[in-house]
């Protein structure tokens, strides 16, 4: 391992281990818990003392997926929550079989905004060719379940 690779590894680890603040001021755990492997890196402290600079520690940690498992019920709840929070949808008219255009009165631009909100909620991109077919909350639930391999 070259010095450049070691330096990059150290800076990545330092950035990963630094606690991050969210808007509310609460400290959250950084992505260190999501790392699959850690490599040999120098001991990190706020100020590296002369003693620690030449020493190396090997940390062997293996963690698996940080994503909570999805279920159809959870996908259903999340889709309906996102739609209820959309200001152009009347929550009293909303159910899983409501058609976005015919029942809820949305136009094509609103439909695009709904699809973008679903992309943000579930963390993956929905291609335009697929988005055109998602005209009901039930269609979105089925699409997300298929994409995330959720079968019940």
Swiss-Prot record:
<dbReference type="GO" id="GO:0000035">
    <property type="term" value="F:acyl binding"/>
</dbReference>
<comment type="similarity">
    <text>Belongs to the acyl carrier protein (ACP) family.</text>
</comment>
<keyword id="KW-0276">Fatty acid metabolism</keyword>
<dbReference type="GO" id="GO:0045271">
    <property type="term" value="C:respiratory chain complex I"/>
</dbReference>
<keyword id="KW-0596">Phosphopantetheine</keyword>
<keyword id="KW-0249">Electron transport</keyword>
<keyword id="KW-0496">Mitochondrion</keyword>
<dbReference type="InterPro" id="IPR003231">
    <property type="entry name" value="ACP"/>
</dbReference>
<dbReference type="GO" id="GO:0005198">
    <property type="term" value="F:structural molecule activity"/>
</dbReference>
<feature type="modified residue" description="O-(pantetheine 4'-phosphoryl)serine">
    <location>
        <position position="108"/>
    </location>
</feature>
<keyword id="KW-0444">Lipid biosynthesis</keyword>
<dbReference type="GO" id="GO:0005739">
    <property type="term" value="C:mitochondrion"/>
</dbReference>
<feature type="domain" description="Carrier">
    <location>
        <begin position="73"/>
        <end position="148"/>
    </location>
</feature>
<dbReference type="InterPro" id="IPR036736">
    <property type="entry name" value="ACP-like_sf"/>
</dbReference>
<comment type="subunit">
    <text>Complex I is composed of about 45 different subunits.</text>
</comment>
<dbReference type="GO" id="GO:0044571">
    <property type="term" value="P:[2Fe-2S] cluster assembly"/>
</dbReference>
<keyword id="KW-0679">Respiratory chain</keyword>
<keyword id="KW-0443">Lipid metabolism</keyword>
<keyword id="KW-0597">Phosphoprotein</keyword>
<dbReference type="GO" id="GO:0006120">
    <property type="term" value="P:mitochondrial electron transport, NADH to ubiquinone"/>
</dbReference>
<dbReference type="GO" id="GO:0005743">
    <property type="term" value="C:mitochondrial inner membrane"/>
</dbReference>
<comment type="function">
    <text>Carrier of the growing fatty acid chain in fatty acid biosynthesis. Accessory and non-catalytic subunit of the mitochondrial membrane respiratory chain NADH dehydrogenase (Complex I), which functions in the transfer of electrons from NADH to the respiratory chain.</text>
</comment>
<dbReference type="GO" id="GO:0099128">
    <property type="term" value="C:mitochondrial [2Fe-2S] assembly complex"/>
</dbReference>
<dbReference type="Pfam" id="PF00550">
    <property type="entry name" value="PP-binding"/>
</dbReference>
<keyword id="KW-0809">Transit peptide</keyword>
<dbReference type="GO" id="GO:0000036">
    <property type="term" value="F:acyl carrier activity"/>
</dbReference>
<protein>
    <recommendedName>
        <fullName>Acyl carrier protein, mitochondrial</fullName>
    </recommendedName>
</protein>
<dbReference type="InterPro" id="IPR009081">
    <property type="entry name" value="PP-bd_ACP"/>
</dbReference>
<keyword id="KW-0275">Fatty acid biosynthesis</keyword>
<keyword id="KW-0813">Transport</keyword>
